[in-house]
Amino acid sequence: MTGPQQGKILLRLENVSREFITGEQTVRVLNNINLTLHSGEMVAIVGTSGSGKSTLMNILGCLDKPSAGEYWVAGRIPQYLGSDALAELRREHFGFIFQRYHLLNDLSARENVEIPAIYAGIDREERRKRAVNLLSRIGLAERLDYRPSQLSGGQQQRVSIARALMNGGDVILADEPTGALDTHSGNEVLNILKDLHQQGHTVVIVTHDMSIAEHAQRIIELKDGEIIADRPRDHAQEKPKMVDIPSVIDIPSMDEKISTGAQQETEIARKPLLTRWKVQYDRLHEAFKMAILAMAAQRLRTALTMLGIIIGIASVVSVVALGKGSQQQVLANINAMGTSTLEIFPGKDFGDMRSAAIHTLRDTDADVLAQQGYIHSVTPTVSTSVTLRYGNKSVSGTVNGVGEQYFLVRGYTIAQGMAFTRTSVNDLMQDAVIDENTRDKLFPNGETPLGKVILLGSLPCRVIGVAAKKQSGFGSDENLNVWIPYTTAMKRMLGQSYLKSITVRVNDDIDLANAEQGVIKLLSQRHGTQDFFVMNTDSIRQTIQATTSTMTLLVSMIAVISLIVGGIGVMNIMLVSVTERTKEIGVRMAVGARASDIMQQFLIEAVLVCLLGGSLGVALSLGIGLLFSLFSSNFSMVYSAASIITAFVCSSLIGVIFGFFPAKRAAEMDPIRALERE
């Protein structure tokens, strides 16, 4: 292949100056630089330390902007472009080769080479194929999956060269490319750069070593920020002895690429691009992978960061589960009193000292209530405490005089025998239904109680049924209870004609509050005054639900504090991560990452930390619930899909909210400052 001819103007600087402010002083690093570079040239910029050569290279590569003057890249003026447009220029036209390689330690050689193509939106398989091809041609086919720490300096610089060529690399900017290499490796790198020049690339070498500069077609000397010489290489001078290596890259010349006056897409960019959503998915996939690698590289720190999120999420989910469990338990206890029931008592309220003297609740009131269309069933109630006897067994218990519908109203189940009937009530029959506690006390040896006669005080009654035990939070389920017809209790035991209370069960399709008003109105008319009060079980239920919800919310707010503390911990660690990975951010920006790409990278990492912490928090909460159920048989934590989904949503929001500032800080970094930071 013949050497390239000088092409059209590619890069041009007019009166470019660059100043930096240090404290109260202004330092001019470049002073009125006028320079034109044509496509296909191989140029060396040489100068001692402090001459401004690196600053000039940064301006050429759109990593920095001039303080004065103008700079053109293929007709475009970078200093008037936004950060994303500058990223596009770097991505599509420039390839950087750094003295210290600037490879990402967590990625393999192939993955390092692929980075520019990720930001260019190239298909995963296409960029992988391209990276393998580039590395194979520069002699690294056997080290595709090696990490930078497993490669020699020369091999790392070759990877850096392949990365510079990934998107085509119209202009290769090499900053001291042999500075950290031995002579043999340095000569190999120079051979590759010269070969790239022969292939049509514009190559700019920045060096302090004139022997390196002599390999270029054109040498530009800088001193104190000014060009003191711009000359072609002296062909009469003996060329340094080089190591002969084969041509490595086969790319169309720059003359072909800009013959129409506009930059054409490189070989890889000519391939069909993915649809917009798939490109975004690919970037998200790579960002996710990098987040995993970053977390894995700092396992202990990641675990400690997640600890606050784990505790916070576990606390919130557990508190909600405890709240729901306690609420369901209390509601079950209320239901044990009877569903949709109204309790009618004499007096104005519980604790009314005059209630004992009010004897206006009668069985006729119960009969009238039973005739109302909105009433499902009614049972009068009287009660007294007596001694229960059978044979030589004597225990204290409660005798309840009730109607035949009592067990239906209260939701009791008859485990043995039967309940008494309306006939038993009308005929004052001495039939009794006992509970399981009474059965166990009076008939401890498993003897059937049915048909047996027991003494309730001095009143003998025949046992016709056994009611199953019923858990209730409003009184102990260990009480001994016996139920007999209320007429029998009133006439043969108590000698009274008034009732202790009336329990009314309302039809399921009737609003309990309306039924309550109906009962109050009816009984007030019968009594001539309201000398009674009504307890609405729905009111109790609503009050307890509201109280439970309030307590759950209160404790949840305390748990949310843990989440906030965890979120602050995530933000702190992400800020540390941004500081530690400043150079990585600079490298990504140099190869074409937009500010949004950098922000997305760190946001995904923050969200991933929080989501993983949230998952572990939910798992911890479920484990707590399992242990809780082992130690508590009559109460359990109740988990809901809504609370778990909410936990994950909260985790994501914490990641976004507390990860936004560190991610924004990373995205707003100046690429050249990031690259220079040690």
Swiss-Prot record:
Domain called ABC transporter: residue spans: 11-249
Which InterPro entries does the record match to this protein? AAA+_ATPase, ABC3_permease_C, ABC_transporter-like_ATP-bd, ABC_transporter-like_CS, MacB-like_ATP-bd, MacB_PCD, Macrolide_Exporter_MacB, P-loop_NTPase
Q: Which UniProt keywords apply?
A: Antibiotic resistance, ATP-binding, Cell inner membrane, Cell membrane, Membrane, Nucleotide-binding, Translocase, Transmembrane, Transmembrane helix, Transport
The record's GO CC annotations read:
plasma membrane
Please give a single GO biological process term from the UniProt record: response to antibiotic
Pfam families for this protein: ABC_tran, FtsX, MacB_PCD
Q: Which residues cross the membrane?
A: 303-323, 558-578, 608-628, 641-661
Q: Where does the UniProt annotation place the signal sequence? A: none
How is this protein positioned relative to the membrane? Multi-pass membrane protein
What GO molecular function annotation could you give as one example from this UniProt entry? ATP binding
Q: What class of enzyme is it?
A: translocase
* UniProt-annotated location(s): Cell inner membrane
Q: According to the UniProt entry, what is the EC number of this protein?
A: 7.6.2.-
Q: Which domain of life is it from?
A: Bacteria
Q: Binding positions for ATP?
A: G47, T48, S49, G50, S51, G52, K53, S54
Function field: Part of the tripartite efflux system MacAB-TolC. MacB is a non-canonical ABC transporter that contains transmembrane domains (TMD), which form a pore in the inner membrane, and an ATP-binding domain (NBD), which is responsible for energy generation. Confers resistance against macrolides.
Family statement: Belongs to the ABC transporter superfamily. Macrolide exporter (TC 3.A.1.122) family.
Subunit text: Homodimer. Part of the tripartite efflux system MacAB-TolC, which is composed of an inner membrane transporter, MacB, a periplasmic membrane fusion protein, MacA, and an outer membrane component, TolC. The complex forms a large protein conduit and can translocate molecules across both the inner and outer membranes. Interacts with MacA.
Full protein name: Macrolide export ATP-binding/permease protein MacB 2
Q: Which source organism does the UniProt entry give?
A: Yersinia pestis
